[in-house]
Amino acid sequence: LKFGTAGLRGILGACINRMNMYTVRKATQGLANYILKQNGAEKGVAIAYDSRHFSPEFSDEAALCLAANGIKAYVFDSLRPTPELSFAVRQLGCISGINITASHNKPQYNGYKVYWEDGAQITPPHDTGIMAEVEAVSDWASVKTMEKQAAIDAGLYQVIGAEIDDAFIETIK
């Protein structure tokens, strides 16, 4: 499964050419490497997901990879629309956002879209920089992860929800 300009999108399944926890972890490790090179770890990453199969699980896999790299993950407590993720990235002052979604694709698909600190999908030079970092992750053993409770205890995994919802709704009124 190849990381493109909008991220990943593919059929769910076991293999390196499918969407699964391993491809999500690899993409996130590449994103984490890029964020670390940008000195953006302290800003954190907001993560949202949709109602597709395994979206909540992929959201957690991404968050735990970020946390293992010392990057705080702000994870929505349930599914949220893409515009709210964009808002959350800006509201929380994050360097990036991840949306676990395959958008308009068929139900057997899922995806992984990356947003930058302006709340928009990644554009040059960040898109090519992140793609290069993802492609550079060739050793699966180099992909970091950690236990969820350890990430919470370390302050690197924070659940978000109503406070962002309220601010988002107030902003778009």
Task: List each language-model region with its residue ranges.
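Gly/Ser/Thr-enriched, mixed-charge loops and adjacent short helices
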Residues: L1, N110-K173
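An N-terminal, well-structured beta->alpha segment
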Residues: L1-A62, A154-K173
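Short, glycine-/Ser/Thr-/acidic-enriched flexible segments
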Residues: L8-G10, C15-N17, R52, R80, ...
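Catalytic-loop motifs flanking and including active-site residues across diverse enzymes
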Residues: T23, A27, P81, H126
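Ferredoxin-reductase
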Residues: G40-E117
